[in-house]
């Protein structure tokens, strides 16, 4: 049951050991680590599909087919982030610091444990492991003041949210007498009495998950962290980390708040609406492409929360499918920027992509496909994700959520189209020659293929 987590932890620690011992061989060790991480995917697919439970006087840890799928998807995006860091270090001429790969792997271990946790305290500890490594990943560029500033904001706000989360756990134990998901589920759904203290405890605990999702109003850290963090860290935060947070939320939703108390339901609904509003409007005035993508993430997390609020199996599937499609599109966009700008990617803005279509037609076309998918143009995968999500919302008579989703999608189309306009209709002062990176090229090829043909594969 714990084989994927054990394998990943050993891979991280042993790889770091060999990276220290074999000075100057970091790139070789990185390639071996990536191969071992790919092996972990096969371990997940082979040994984690059957339902099993770990007991330590009570249920602490569980796995099943859904959880195994989540872990496999997260690990795929983790591997992509590792490849991006490896190739970016080559293109930028910076030395490959193996600690980065170790931190990403340990963060993923925390996500894995959190997804399988059946106890609030275990879930908190797992999320803290992910949070602590994420703070370091955000501030990994020690020479960059913006990186340090973003990491410091991330750490301070994250620490505050962790305190709220622990405060919520104390409420849960005090009013519920247990930290087990199953026990709290029973008490929350006991129609004979409404335990307001228990509801408050759950809501306080959920604040840590909403912070990790960068959903409004807990989103203010995201633009600064995205702007200052290394591009490989940003890809990890946008894809693997966000998918993990959504999986944790769906796990809690299934076991604890399937029948929402009105307080928690309305609170999550407000968070979804605020995320859509802040995400759509906040991105309009941005000039930095990384800050723009931070607001885009906030907006799209609002869409994901629509699926969570529906409280149905189809709603959960719609939420995770949409998150997967958005994560793939974001990865594709960032890899295009790296291929185009090299060591200037971390300072990418609209001026950086002016007129690139004239000299770099393939990259411009790839970005076009990605932007159209984010807008939701058929028959791209982004259209399928939005259609499925909004259709489920309308079916469940959540008209306000659906209307807000459609309205903010129209607003978001403005800045996605602005990127396309800048590439094709602005003049590029000095054309640059781009060296080929086969790792990034392969990632982009897979992403574009998924966005183009994913809707046909998924619908069939």
UniProtKB/Swiss-Prot annotation:
Protein name: NADH-quinone oxidoreductase subunit N
EC number: 7.1.1.-
GO biological process terms held by the UniProt record: ATP synthesis coupled electron transport
Class of the enzyme per the UniProt entry, highest EC level: translocase
Annotated TM spans: 2-22, 28-48, 65-85, 104-124, 155-175, 196-216, 230-250, 263-283, 292-312, 321-341, 363-383, 400-420, 438-458
NCBIfam families: NDH_I_N (TIGR01770), PRK05777.2-5 (NF004447)
Description of how the protein assembles with itself and partners: NDH-1 is composed of 14 different subunits. Subunits NuoA, H, J, K, L, M, N constitute the membrane sector of the complex.
Claim: Disulfide bond is one of the keywords in the record: no
Main location (coarse class): membrane
